[in-house]
Regions:
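Two-component/phosphorelay signaling modules centered on CheY-like receiver
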Residues: 10-29, 43
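Short amphipathic alpha-helix used as the core "switch/output" element in two-component signaling
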Residues: 39, 61-75, 92
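Acidic, metal-coordinating helix/loop segments flanking the phosphotransfer/catalytic sites
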Residues: 30-48
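Active-site residues of response regulator receiver
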Residues: 8, 52-54
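AAA+ ATPase active-site-proximal loops
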Residues: 132-148
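A Lys-centered signature of the CheY-like receiver
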Residues: 9, 104, 144
Length: 148
């Protein structure tokens, strides 16, 4: 299935999300702070990131990690979670490129629905991007402009 990185400073939350996703057939990596999250992201390029906004004892908060992810891998969907949910946080996360926002405590069905939608949307975006690049390359090979 998919490689998903879960970033949360709370071990119980990381373990719960990991178990849910593992049971759905996903490969899951865990990070408890911004340093380990950025390290995983730079080494392995996850298919999706589940990211807590408030990371205690971290150099970066979730919004800063989100900005970094979107600069380096704009097609990677990020689902933001927070136990301190308010509309301002959700709006800020979506403005920075988050796919969706889930408030803790969440229910399993909600989490899986959002993750499945995010993965499918990402797959379709990558497919469109690939087809566009293929068309551009074919157009260059025949010396055309791609226009009819």
């Amino acid at each position: 299935m998919s490689y998903i990185l879960v970033v949360d400073d709370e071990k119980d939350i990381r373990d719960l999300i990991s178990q849910i996703l593992f049971e759905e057939g996903h490969t899951v990596k865990l990070a408890q702070n911004s340093t380990s999250a950025i390290d995983y992201i730079n080494r392995e390029e996850p298919d999706l990131i589940v990211l807590d906004i408030w990371l205690k004892d971290s150099e970066m908060d979730g919004i800063e990690i989100l900005k970094s992810v979107k600069q380096n891998n704009p097609l990677c969907p990020v689902v933001v979670i927070s136990g301190h949910g308010n509309i301002e946080i959700a709006v800020a996360a979506v403005k920075q490129g988050a796919y969706d926002f889930i408030e803790k405590p969440f229910n399993t069905d909600q989490l899986l629905l959002v993750i499945d939608r995010a993965l499918e949307t990402s797959r379709l975006r990558k497919e469109v991007y690939s087809l566009q690049n293929k068309e551009i390359n074919e157009s260059k090979m025949v010396g055309g402009t791609g226009a009819f």
